[in-house]
């Protein structure tokens, strides 16, 4: 591999070939309160 990246492929890139996708909401981590409540229910 060379030290410098090969830009020839990037310059030939065609944005019109990309497909439009629907973005989905990411799963958020539970809060500390939620974790504590779940632990109490299990015990």
From Swiss-Prot:
GO cellular component, one term: cytoplasm
Organism for this UniProt entry: Cyprinus carpio (Common carp)
InterPro entries referenced in this protein's UniProt entry, alphabetically: Beta-thymosin, Beta-thymosin_sf
Gene3D superfamilies reported for this sequence: Single helix bin
A GO BP annotation: actin filament organization
Signal peptide extent: none
Function: Plays an important role in the organization of the cytoskeleton. Binds to and sequesters actin monomers (G actin) and therefore inhibits actin polymerization.
Stretches with biased composition (Basic and acidic residues): 1-25, 33-43
UniProt-recorded name of the protein: Thymosin beta-b
Taxonomy, superkingdom: Eukaryota
Protein family (similarity comment): Belongs to the thymosin beta family.
Region of interest (Disordered), ranges: 1-43
Subcellular compartments: Cytoplasm, Cytoskeleton
